[in-house]
Each structure stands twice: as structure tokens, then as C-alpha cells.
Amino acid sequence: MTSQHTADYPTLQEVLRLPVFAGCTVCGGAAGLGRRVSGVNLTDTPDYARWLAQGELLITTGFSIADDPQAIRGLLPTAAEQGLSGVGIKPGRYLPNPLPTELAETADRL
């Protein structure tokens, strides 16, 4: 198996231009759109942080953290600590739509 140089990975902005992301909105952290995406991780498990790898784009509905305000506040800092390229949250069912402004503010800081 060969390893791919990170410069070969698409940027988050390029990934978000794919048809599957049509209609998605960047709510915060726009300064990070140049980060390289090495893979995608779809998870809603309570121990999601165990399964994250640097460079991934995490996509979640927030199911496992919806009833835990501390876990919601910790989602983006945890993602940053793990070196993720970004976090995509599908709001509406488990997390409010629109998402809390606190999440956007945190994304902008990170």
C-alpha cells in the first residue's frame, strides 16, 4: 500500500463543491476551507473521538451528543485536537436548525 502525499488530497472547499454537498452551508470556520481532507468519517457513536484520524472530515447528525450540552460544546475542540479537516453536522433531527451560534463561534476560533 502506498501513502499519498497530503498535497494530493482535496481541500475541504473542493470536497464541499461535490454534488453530494449541494445545499450545505458553511456556518463557521471558513478560514479552514483550505485544509486537506484525507478521508471521511461518518459517526454518531458516543465514543466517536476514538475512531477519528488526522485529516478526516467528520460528518454527524449529533445523535449521540444531542442531550448533552457539554458534549455538544466539546465536539469542535475535540475535532481540532484530533487534527480533523472539518466537521459536517446535519441539523434538524437531533441538533437544532439552525445550529447554535456558539458552534459557529467556536469553529471560527479554531
Task: For every predicted segment, state its role.
Residues 1-110:
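Alpha-helical/coil-rich non-catalytic "connector" segments in signaling and regulatory proteins
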